[in-house]
Amino acid sequence: MVKSKLTRFALLIISLVLSISVLAGCGESGSSNTSTSGNSSSGSDAGSSKPVTILNVSYDPTRELYQEYNEAFVKYWKNKTGQDVTVQQSHGGSGSQARTVIDGNEADVVTLALAYDIDSINKNKELINKEWQKRLPDNSTPYTSTIVFLVRKDNPKNIKDWDDLIKPGIQVITPNPKTSGGARWNYLAAWGYALKKNNNDEQKAREFVKALFENVPVLDSGARGSTTTFVERGIGDVLIAWENEAFLSINELGKDKFKIVVPSISILAEPPVSVVDSVVDKKGTREVAEAYLEYLYSDEGQEIAAKNYYRPRNEAIAKKFENQFPKINLFTIDEVFGGWGKAQKEHFDDGGVFDQIYVKK
């Protein structure tokens, strides 16, 4: 049986013969892939031309982004320093990925779905400098995204906005907020909509989100799993999705099968990045790890982000791709929820609002 295009891009099976090899990689959570710049040659990185390997522990829907970006970075680093660098990838639900680092997965860099997940890596001991968000522009968030809806051909349930997701008989697909960063963005986007519609009435927002999750038949652990449930397994009427994941589904499977619905209001999703200080200092990889994240802000890095449907921070690159992204009324987590620390504690920690309103199927 021929696998669908979505299965092929999710598994990232690359057979092109390139000067940059794509090998089988490692990682303790989710799937992995490795990019390398090829044979070692003379050059220097901190006084050494020895090949170096770094591990990027990332969240679910960045697989395609970092597959392309890693190839670009290793070429850039080879040309600049003469040094070969191998980038290994690990992908999964953002919260689960953070926990693997806490448990000893030696990530040189983390590129996760939200700031709280990076902060949580310091739960038991300080692995990352507490001022990590100040080390790179835009609070160490080189690209942004938002939350949209993916519906089936011709939108048979006529889904137009958040209110339609709580109607009787509508099946909504979204991941588990306890394990997935994207799911937490989805949840907060819905909560923020309900607040703004109901004059900041917290009780009405709670009732709205409770009703929404009553329409969720299954909670996958990560965003890519929910996409597979909706697209391949045919479950659900609407997928609440990262914008890039919705675009990717349409481009891989065709506009004749799915349609993106842009809600009247959504949340500005800011997925941050950081080196893991304890690991890079132990392994001696700080220079290349920092350069790896800094290059995300380069023109090439920003173009790669935009081509993979992440909204670039660079204004010139954003202008170039402005017709690709719909205009959406966005609010921030700081404006509505007082930041990730407060939102996590109130809504997603054990015994929080989500645990109170969600009834397991």
Question: Across the structure, where does each feature detected by a protein language model lie?
Answer:
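Extracytoplasmic
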Residues: 49-51, 82-84, 96, 104-106, ...
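C-terminal motif of bacterial Sec signal peptides marking the signal peptidase cleavage site
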Residues: 21-25
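Ligand-binding pocket segment of bilobal, Venus flytrap-like solute-binding proteins
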Residues: 198-264
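Early extracytoplasmic/lumenal segment of secretory-pathway proteins
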Residues: 26-30, 34, 38-124, 134-136, ...
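A conserved helix-loop-strand patch within extracytoplasmic ligand-binding domains
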Residues: 122-196
